[in-house]
Amino acid sequence: MMQSREEIRDDSSSGLVLTTDPKPRLRWTTELHERFVDAVTHLGGPEKATPKTIMRVMGVKGLTLYHLKSHLQKFRLGKQPHKEHSQNHSICIRDTNRASMLDLRRNAVFTTSPLIIGRNMNEMQMEVQRRIEEEVVIERQVNQRIAAQGKYMESMLEKACETQEASLTKDYSTLFFDRTNICNNTSSIPIPWFEDHFPSSSSMDSTLILPDINSNFSLQDSRSSITKGRTVCLG
C-alpha cells in the first residue's frame, strides 16, 4: 500500500508530476517552476499575482488553486529551493564581478606609467594656480570697490560741509544787514514828547533875540536914577 502511494503519474504534455495519493501532491519540477515564475513575472510580481490568474496564464492541466496557492506563499516567503539556488548563484556572480573589478583597479594602479602620474600632477598644479589667480583678481576687485565707495562718501561729506557753511554765511549776512537797517531807522524816528517840551534848534534860534546895546544903556540909566531918588527920600 505504501508502494502505491509512491507511484507517480507523469503527464509529459504538461510537465505536471502528481503522486497517486488520495490527495495528490504536486512535484514542482524545474520546468514547472520556470513556467510558474514566468507567469508571476508576467502578472507584475508575486505581490500582484493571484493563484487564479497564475493558473490562467500557465494553462497547465491538472494544476489546482490549492497547488498554486501553496507554491505562491512559499515563493513570496523565499523558501523555494529554485529561488534560493538562483539567489545564491546571483550572489556568487556579483561577488566574482566585484573581485574582478578590484583586481582590475589594483592592476591599473600598479601598472600606471610615471608619465601619466606626472601629467596628473601637472594638471593639479595648474588647477591650483588658476584658483589662486582667480582669488587674487576677486580680492583686487573688492579693494577697488571699497576705495571707490570711500571716495564717494568723502566727496558727499565735503559737499555737505560746503553747503552748510554757505547757508551759515548767508544767514549771518542777512542778520547783520537787518540790524544795520534797524539802527538807521531808529535814529530818524521823531519823539513827540521831546519835541513838545524842547523846541528844535531852528525855532530856538528864531525866538532868541539879543537886545541892542542902546537899550541896555537906557535901562542902566533908569536903574541909576531910581537908586538916586531912593537915597534922597531917605535923607
Curated annotation (Swiss-Prot):
Keywords: Coiled coil, DNA-binding, Nucleus, Transcription, Transcription regulation. Expressed in phloem and/or cambium. GO terms for molecular function: DNA binding; DNA-binding transcription factor activity. Belongs to the MYB-CC family. NCBIfam families: myb_SHAQKYF. PANTHER family: MYB FAMILY TRANSCRIPTION FACTOR PHL11, MYB FAMILY TRANSCRIPTION FACTOR PHL12. This is Myb family transcription factor PHL12. The gene is PHL12.
